[in-house]
């Protein structure tokens, strides 16, 4: 498989390539083989973090920051997870955005758990729980256009959705969760 990275920060190029390889490997082990021959991570003028397409993700070049590599890794892992959740397993992203975004966000937690240990995954879950504490009555099962604003959308679709998958995992256990 060919992994390409394009960015203007030469110091981070090797790390970005490693993150891309690690995320493809981890997600292939968890969800099934990556179905394409190539994968590209491209830095771009993109104000919302990242965007996914089959075999290609665009990452906001402002995230290529040596002082905060965690956020860069998080966004690359998240956008890479979209290669499964939306690209391989499609859904209606407008009517049911929680399906791919919640799975993708939870997959990002799984990436960090697999790469750095369960404690890191648990910290990410705790952060998500704190972020959503005051939004617990909001429904995640709405169309994209039904959210009040981008913060409401993000907290519900990404964060609460990921927490819902975490609750399922806790209820059924790892063996059943990852087998299904």
List each language-model region with its residue ranges:
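Juxtacatalytic substrate-recognition/specificity segment
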Residues: 1-83, 87-96, 107, 147-151
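Glycine-rich, acidic and aromatic/proline-enriched surface loops and short helix-turn segments
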Residues: 29-33, 46-48, 130-134, 170, ...
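Positions in alpha-helical segments
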Residues: 70, 163-166, 179
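Alpha-helix C-capping/helix-to-loop hinge sites
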Residues: 87, 168-171
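Short, intrinsically disordered, charge-balanced linker/junction segments flanking boundaries
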Residues: 174-180
């Amino acid at each position: 498989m060919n992994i390409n990275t394009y960015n203007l920060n030469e110091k981070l190029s090797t790390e970005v390539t490693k993150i891309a390889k690690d995320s493809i490997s981890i997600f292939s082990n968890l969800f099934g083989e990556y179905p394409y021959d190539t994968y590209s991570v491209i830095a771009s003028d993109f104000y919302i973090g990242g965007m996914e397409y089959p075999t290609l993700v665009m990452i906001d070049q402002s995230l290529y920051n040596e002082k905060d590599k965690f956020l860069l890794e998080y966004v690359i892992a998240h956008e890479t997870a979209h290669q499964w959740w939306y690209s391989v397993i499609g859904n209606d992203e407008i009517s049911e955005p929680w399906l791919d975004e919640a799975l993708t966000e939870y997959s990002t937690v799984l990436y960090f758990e697999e790469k750095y240990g369960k404690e890191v995954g648990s910290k990410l879950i705790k952060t998500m729980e704190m972020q959503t504490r005051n939004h617990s009555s909001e429904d995640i099962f709405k169309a994209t256009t039904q959210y009040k604003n981008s913060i409401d959308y993000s907290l519900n679709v990404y964060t609460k959705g990921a927490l819902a998958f975490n609750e399922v995992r806790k209820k059924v256990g790892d063996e059943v969760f990852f087998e299904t």
